[in-house]
Curated annotation (Swiss-Prot):
The lineage of its organism: Eukaryota, Metazoa, Chordata, Craniata, Vertebrata. Testis-specific. InterPro entries: TEX47-like (IPR055308). The gene is TEX47. This is Testis-expressed protein 47. It comes from Homo sapiens (Human).
Length: 253
């Protein structure tokens, strides 16, 4: 398409090109604006994803477990700058599986809070917590909010694979199933919904991890508890020995 512009003789007025250029700029709708705003908000800090397992007392109210985490998340974000926590908490009869997504500093504070309760209380209702894996600098969240689901599947319907598989096979099944479940929930749940609720074993029974695997990982010595991880986290990478103190000071690369 071409445009012909006729100037009057002797006229020095600039051509009205601004309206033409303005029409060529794509306009974004309000939804696109909100999505871009959310994307920029989530990029304030580098995001990490952490997988935790732990045992809980059989007589503890499932609501108490969920309330503990909700109140703790609010307290951490109130006193420390960081990203909001999103993820999934599966509460089994005697154990929990927790997937958390947030900034590293926020996840660090979550572990410290658990350590504080274990030290200060005679018997804390969450016990034998183990860190299975931490993924650093993840490109995006799988969960846009934090969800809780109580699993009420009878043990008799779940096969105990821990008796016939090696630790490598068990952890492979654990990571595979949890990632499949996370992707499924990411694709099916919309922002603002309450989440899967307590019927997850009916909605996605094939993606549900047997409780025996969680309890098996809680007892495994190959995985760190929060206290051991925090001690390693705070330990300096390079330790200077007395024999290394020379002048000029050596440089490390």
């Amino acid at each position: 398409m071409s445009f012909s512009v006729h100037n009057q003789k002797g006229s020095k007025r600039p051509l009205p090109l601004e309206p033409l250029l303005f029409l060529q700029v794509p306009r974004s709708n309000y939804l696109h604006f909100q999505e871009e705003k959310q994307r920029l908000h989530l990029k304030k800090f580098l995001l990490d994803r952490m997988f935790l397992v732990a045992k809980i007392q059989a007589n503890v109210e499932r609501k108490d477990v969920a309330d503990y985490y909700e109140q703790m998340f609010q307290s951490v974000l109130k006193h420390h700058l960081g990203e909001a926590v999103t993820g999934l908490l599966l509460i089994y009869p005697t154990s929990i599986l927790h997937i958390l997504e947030s900034s590293s500093d926020t996840l660090y504070k979550v572990l410290l809070d658990y350590i504080g309760h274990v030290k200060d209380e005679t018997v804390f209702f969450i016990q034998q917590m183990k860190i299975i894996v931490i993924s650093h600098n993840i490109p995006m969240r799988l969960f846009m909010q934090w969800h809780v689901s109580v699993i009420k599947v009878p043990v008799m319907y779940l096969d105990d694979v821990t008796q016939s598989q090696s630790l490598k096979e068990v952890i492979t099944d654990f990571l595979t199933q949890t990632h499949k479940l996370s992707l499924y929930l990411c694709q099916t749940m919309k922002v603002g919904t309450k989440g899967p609720g307590d019927n997850l074993h009916q909605v996605a029974p094939d993606l549900l991890l047997p409780e025996q695997i969680i309890k098996y990982l809680c007892k495994s010595e190959e995985f760190m508890d929060p206290a051991t991880f925090i001690n390693m986290y705070n330990r300096p990478i390079h330790i200077t020995l007395d024999s290394e103190v020379v002048w000029p000071a050596p440089s490390r690369f």
